[in-house]
């Protein structure tokens, strides 16, 4: 990106929703998320987000995919040979942890009610929510208990998170918690369980 003249703002380990939020509110041209989503680490791919915080059109993503796979020369030689920027136009890399912190502040601002006294269980899937979810619930006043919050780059979604809700169900019941939330690796999916370990469906969450 920088070699082609773009400036890259690094949010570091963060969630897909945070990239979408920052792309929109900070007027970026686009957002890029490297993620395996709810899959194993070796399925890492690229999620492309437009300046409105929405998923880019399918045709745009297919164009990028063809460029990566070196297929574009068949259709358009100019696209296939994108030039590097001249030295004076090379982009810069910016450490933008402040953007992730801004997203966390936004989440906290959405809290209408205090969670004081509520025992909340979180399953972070050893993914990108590990350094966000607990901090948000703590500020909202919850007594927060967390599992699968030690990512090492290989253990993401490994018998953890929203695709393995049984782990959170057991954790909530055994520790007498009031509610539990399980995220997938990039935290754009969430499942909820009640104090008895029953899964709260998406319809119920939407209603709440």
Protein language model annotation of sequence segments:
Residues 1-43, 135-193:
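N-terminal small/polar loop signature for handling phosphorylated ligands or for N-terminal nucleophile
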Residues 15, 129, 202-206:
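Catalytic-loop motifs flanking and including active-site residues across diverse enzymes
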Residues 21, 67, 103-106, 183, ...:
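Aromatic side chains
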Residues 28, 74-75, 208:
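Short, charged/polar low-complexity linear motifs in solvent-exposed/disordered segments
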Residues 39, 53-54, 127, 187-188, ...:
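Short, glycine-/Ser/Thr-/acidic-enriched flexible segments
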Residues 44-173:
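Gly/Ser/Thr-enriched, mixed-charge loops and adjacent short helices
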Residues 48-51, 191-195:
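Short beta-strand-to-turn element immediately C-terminal to the catalytic PLP-Schiff-base lysine
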Residues 55-57, 146, 198-208:
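Gly/Ser/Thr-rich active-site loops/lids in small-molecule metabolic enzymes
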């Amino acid at each position: 990106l920088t070699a082609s003249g773009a400036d890259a703002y690094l949010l570091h380990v963060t969630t897909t929703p945070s990239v979408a939020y920052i792309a929109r509110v900070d007027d970026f041209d686009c957002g890029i998320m490297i993620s395996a989503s709810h899959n194993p680490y070796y399925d890492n791919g690229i999620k492309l987000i437009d300046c409105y915080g929405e998923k880019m059109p399918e045709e745009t993503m297919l164009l990028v995919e063809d460029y990566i796979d070196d297929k574009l020369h068949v259709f358009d030689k100019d696209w296939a040979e994108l030039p590097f920027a001249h030295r004076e136009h090379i982009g810069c890399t910016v450490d933008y942890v402040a953007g992730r912190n801004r997203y966390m502040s936004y989440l906290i601002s959405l809290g209408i009610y205090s969670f004081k006294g509520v025992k909340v269980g979180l399953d972070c899937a050893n993914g990108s929510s590990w350094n966000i979810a607990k901090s948000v619930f703590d500020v909202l006043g919850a007594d927060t208990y967390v599992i699968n919050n030690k990512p090492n780059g290989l253990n993401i979604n490994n018998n953890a998170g929203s695709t393995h809700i049984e782990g959170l169900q057991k954790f909530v019941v055994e520790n007498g918690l009031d509610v539990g939330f399980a995220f997938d690796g990039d935290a754009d999916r969430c499942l909820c369980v009640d104090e008895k370990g029953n899964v709260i469906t998406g319809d119920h969450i939407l209603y709440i």
